[in-house]
From Swiss-Prot:
Name of the coding gene: cysD
Name of the protein described by the UniProt record: Sulfate adenylyltransferase subunit 2
Family: Belongs to the PAPS reductase family. CysD subfamily.
GO molecular function list: ATP binding; sulfate adenylyltransferase (ATP) activity
Record pathway: Sulfur metabolism; hydrogen sulfide biosynthesis; sulfite from sulfate: step 1/3
Length: 309
């Protein structure tokens, strides 16, 4: 005789979903940093990954206030929609925003402006802000699926007194045990989203109804093509004489400096539609739409060795 009774998990064997496991891991990392370090900061650009990270950090300490500030390294070449969302989310969360300006470093002669993109020189601004504010840990939204240099970086990534990363001297990380030991002047970069994928990020955004800048969804925009990428026409990004401008329905998979961030043609106007597109994507968002990663095969690793995000 057969039975139609479905046997569920035994009492005490409650199972978390994949997304909730990732959430729990990230919250554990954030709380670990808050307990272990004196002056942490959350790097916050207003992009999807940093917004998810802020959402997780607020959740980690609710109903209390976030016990550390957020910081944006501002190149001055930003998408207006992203800056507006950044300011609104920070105000709604009631957290302190530190803005580290690349323009200030250019004006002070600490760096020489690079053309067309300021992306390479923002490392100087980042390290200056960490040093001046005496931050000993900085949360970043990097994920291992984005790029090969990030794929081999630890959750707790040690930086020396010059802010440099040495991939050959990384510390072992067993299970959920993290080594935050450092001397004065050194700091740790912390990546709570290391084990997330782009698909996970969008699934979590949908599940938690996380608000994003409008440019992550399909919209009409004037663009031009350069090096196989669609770039947006912007006051800081103008086409060359041989680059015709046309209007297309596009969205951005990742958000960074206007001068090195491309968009993709898309009709996805909702989170569900973006998730469906992401599920069949064969290139990561950085591989598909970030010109700064195409400088060389080791472009990201070279920048990270110098102190980049």
């Amino acid at each position: 005789m057969t039975s139609d009774v479905t046997v569920g998990p035994a009492p005490g064997q409650y199972q978390l979903s994949h997304l909730r496991l990732l959430e729990a891991e990230a919250i554990h990392v954030i709380r670990e940093v808050a307990a272990e370090f004196e002056r942490p900061v959350l790097l916050f650009s207003g992009g999807k990954d940093s917004i998810v990270m802020l959402h997780l950090a607020l959740k980690a300490f609710r109903p209390g206030r976030l016990p550390f500030p957020v910081m944006h390294v501002d190149t001055g070449h930003n998408f207006d929609e992203v800056i507006a969302t950044r300011d609104e989310l920070v105000a709604a969360a009631g957290v302190r925003l530190v803005v580290a300006s690349v323009q200030d470093d250019i004006d002070a002669g600490r760096v020489v402006e690079t053309i067309p993109s300021r992306n390479p020189i923002q490392t100087v601004t980042l390290l200056r802000a960490i040093r001046e504010n005496q931050f000993d840990a900085a949360f970043g939204g990097a994920r291992r699926d984005e790029e090969k240099a990030r794929a081999k970086e630890r959750v707790f990534s040690f930086r020396d007194e010059f802010g440099q990363w040495d991939p050959k001297a990384q510390r072992p990380e067993l299970w959920n045990l993290y080594n935050g030991r450092h001397h004065k002047g050194e700091h740790i970069r912390v990546f709570p989203l290391s084990n997330w994928t782009e698909f996970d990020i969008w699934s979590y955004i949908g599940a938690e109804q996380v608000r994003l800048p409008s440019i992550y969804f399909a919209h009409r925009r004037k663009v031009f093509q350069r090096d196989g990428m669609l770039l947006a026409v912007h006051r800081h990004m103008q086409p060359r004489a041989d680059e015709p401008v046309f209007e297309a329905t596009v969205r951005f998979r990742t958000v960074g400096d206007v001068t090195c961030t491309g968009c993709v043609e898309s009709s996805a106007s909702t989170v569900a539609e973006v998730i469906a597109e992401t599920a069949v994507a064969r290139l990561t968002e950085r591989g598909a739409t970030r010109a700064d990663d195409r400088i060389s095969e080791a472009g990201m690793e070279d920048r990270k060795r110098q102190g980049y995000f």
